[in-house]
């Protein structure tokens, strides 16, 4: 097929019928990632690396405006109408901190391949009209009230405890030169002064084929797929947005080659100004603690989020080990952290969750504690530190750890059977955003079972060493 060059192809080692291929257009730089497996549904995730250094919410506003029509189909509702004819449940999208993805799921491939070029026309060549901006993003209504779909959505979120704590964490971890610091949904104060011209400029820069990937999941006829992809690639050339495989001169890959690639910082004594707001207290080397106020009628409880810097994103074994360790610590009423904080006469919280955000520079591990009694807010992270040190001194319950590992294997295989598109899409989107462009990093990303085999050989000492390195001796950020 003219223009689309083979980059990478691999079978899943533990599921040979599942194959992943990656291509990159030599004419436009458009990346295509295709996971092939038998399934009645076909999924697409049109993904763009959307880097923004302000709180204007431009990536989020674009996500909404795309659905209002395109150059070839300048009417709202065209996508939903076509989706119904293709046995699809409409179209959808999400805006994350580092990307925007537009989703399509259809029953069967015929309607899917007919709809994909239409969907891409909406994403890459939207109308972006003044009237669409006024209705969808921001306006003042007849009652002299702030209004607009995006504005109203963020009005409902901006002052929630979860959003306030997450934004404060981002502000503390990243310097002002990093896009990870931004509120990509848009703060209300910024949305009120945003203009359609700013959105058009952003779209022209980031909604380009060299900064986009079409992630496909499901069974498709190769010849028909390449025909559809070729029509999409040709459209870029026709519209003059094709700037070659590597983009225009001076183009830098978002998050990977820009200032956002700088690792986050918790130890504020080593890099002046990184992640520090003027009103925040000075940090010490092992603990930075900040407070966030949010509107709440019940002042008897609060929330606590503790963050540590994790390994780099390419250390997949260490990341999977930390994921398993987090499950061991929190997954059930018999887990150590549930026993210590929840399953007691006077609970110190009602729920605990440990997860990680995989970002350029370093990943970030975060433990979230819900509904913490106000009297315990100041002491919770110290209580956690004492518990973790006690676990290290007593050792890991290896019988239970083996059970956790076995259950995690079974959960992955079950998801691969029941929801394969979800399993593949996360890995493939991550590879597009941060992976090596020749596809050589995919082999390791897809081989979860090999890593489970390696973790099966971990001793109690190996697990406690991991716990000590990342959750005890590592500097922590405490947001209360």
Regions found by a protein language model. Name each.
Residues 213-302:
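An aromatic/glycine/proline-enriched structural segment found at the starts
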Residues 36-78, 82, 316-329:
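Active/ligand-binding-proximal structured segments within catalytic/core domains
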Residues 1-8:
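Short, small-residue-biased leader/transition segments that mark boundaries at the very start
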Residues 69-71, 78-202, 247-251, 306, ...:
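Acidic/histidine-enriched segments that form metal/cofactor-coordinating
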Residues 50-52, 106-110, 218-222, 310-313, ...:
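A generic structural motif
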Residues 218, 404-480:
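C-terminal regions of mature proteins
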Residues 46, 104, 304-307, 363-371:
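Short, hydrophobic beta-strand segments
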Residues 18-22, 154-159, 163-213, 222, ...:
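Histidine-acidic residue clusters that define the catalytic metal-binding segment
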């Amino acid at each position: 097929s003219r223009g689309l060059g083979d980059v990478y192809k691999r079978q899943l080692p533990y599921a040979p019928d599942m194959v992943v291929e990656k291509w990159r257009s030599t004419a436009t730089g458009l990346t295509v990632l295709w996971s092939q497996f038998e399934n009645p549904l076909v999924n697409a995730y049109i993904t763009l690396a959307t880097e923004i250094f302000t709180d204007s919410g431009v990536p989020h506003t674009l996500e909404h405006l795309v659905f209002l029509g395109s150059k070839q189909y300048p009417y709202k509702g065209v996508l939903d109408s076509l989706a119904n004819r293709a046995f699809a449940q409409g179209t959808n999208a999400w805006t994350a901190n580092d990307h925007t993805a537009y989703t399509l799921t259809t029953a069967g491939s015929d309607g899917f391949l007919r709809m994909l070029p239409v969907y891409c026309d909406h994403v890459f060549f939207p109308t972006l009209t003044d009237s669409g901006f006024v209705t969808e993003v921001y306006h003042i209504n007849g009652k002299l009230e702030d209004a607009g779909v995006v504005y109203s959505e963020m009005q409902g979120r901006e002052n929630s405890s979860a959003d306030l704590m997450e934004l404060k964490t981002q502000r503390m971890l990243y310097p002002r030169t990093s896009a990870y610091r931004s509120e990509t949904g848009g703060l209300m104060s910024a949305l009120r002064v945003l203009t359609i011209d700013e959105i058009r400029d952003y779209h022209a820069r980031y909604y380009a084929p060299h900064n986009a990937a079409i992630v496909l999941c499901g069974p498709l006829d190769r010849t028909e797929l390449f025909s559809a992809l070729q029509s999409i690639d040709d459209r870029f050339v026709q519209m003059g947005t094709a700037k070659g495989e590597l983009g225009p001169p001076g183009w830098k890959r978002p998050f990977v080659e820009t200032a956002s690639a700088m690792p986050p910082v918790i130890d504020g004594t080593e890099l002046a100004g990184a992640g520090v707001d003027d009103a925040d207290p000075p940090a010490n080397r092992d603990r930075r603690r900040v407070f966030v106020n949010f509107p709440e009628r019940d002042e008897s409880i609060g929330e606590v989020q503790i963050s540590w810097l994790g390994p780099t994103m390419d250390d997949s074994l260490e990341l999977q080990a930390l994921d398993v360790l987090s499950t061991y610590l929190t997954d059930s009423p018999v887990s150590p952290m549930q026993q210590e904080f929840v399953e007691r006469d006077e609970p110190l919280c009602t729920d605990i969750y440990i997860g990680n955000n995989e970002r350029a520079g370093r990943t970030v591990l975060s433990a979230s504690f819900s509904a913490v009694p106000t009297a315990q807010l100041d002491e919770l992270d110290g209580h956690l530190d004492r518990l973790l040190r006690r676990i290290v001194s007593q050792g890991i319950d290896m019988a239970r750890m083996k059970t956790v590992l076995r259950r995690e294997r079974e959960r992955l295989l079950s998801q691969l059977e029941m929801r394969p598109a979800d399993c593949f899409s996360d890995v493939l989107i991550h590879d597009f955003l941060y992976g090596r462009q020749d596809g050589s990093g995919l082999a390791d990303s897809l081989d979860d079972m090999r890593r489970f085999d390696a973790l099966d050989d971990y001793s109690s000492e190996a697990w406690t060493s991991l716990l000590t390195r990342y959750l005890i001796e590592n500097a922590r950020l405490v947001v209360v």
